[in-house]
Amino acid sequence: MCLLERVSAWDTRHIRCEANSHRDSANPLRAHGRLGAACGIEYAAQAMAVHGALLAETDSAATSQRPAMGYLVSVRGVTLHVDRLDDLSAALSIHAERSGGDSGTVLYSFTLHAGPRLLLGGRAAVILDAHGLALPQRSATTPPKS
């Protein structure tokens, strides 16, 4: 599912994307005939993922490594300034700013706007290549520990 239409600007710390999919009646995030404002978090997460891919593409020329897969593990301080997104006529502008991190985690702050109107904002944490953090899988023949 790709909700974003274009990247309008980006650098090593920021990305700005645009989307019109919030008005699409077939938007996969719609429920009960509406697209709630909290769905804006998915728009922001997709912008963060695109930012990571763009950074990895620039780095991969030097390192020949495949991009790290990221997992959104936390959103904090989210403030919703509207109830829904599907009734907005203006395009969504999604801005994410990388505010910190290391080789295993990335921290972002994000906002969504429709024109000058702030729709929501918050912070997110992403873990990169989390497969190493997975719990060991139990076999079907091994009884659970009590």
Cite the ranges covered by each PLM segment.
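Catalytic strand-loop segment that frames the active site of acyl-thioester-processing enzymes
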Residues: 1-36
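Hydrophobic core residues within well-ordered beta-strands of beta-rich domains
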Residues: 1-3, 92, 106
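Hydrophobic residues on conserved beta-strands that form the core of alpha/beta folds
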Residues: 4-5, 75, 107, 121
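A residue-level detector for short acidic-glycine micro-motifs
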Residues: 6-9, 82, 98-100, 126
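Beta-strand residues in well-ordered beta-sheet regions across diverse protein folds
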Residues: 18, 95, 109-111
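Compact, glycine-rich, soluble single-domain proteins
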Residues: 31-51, 69-70, 77
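Hydrophobic beta-strand-centered segment that forms part of the acyl-chain substrate-binding groove
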Residues: 50-95
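Mixed-charge, glycine-accented linear interaction segment located at domain edges/termini
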Residues: 99-145
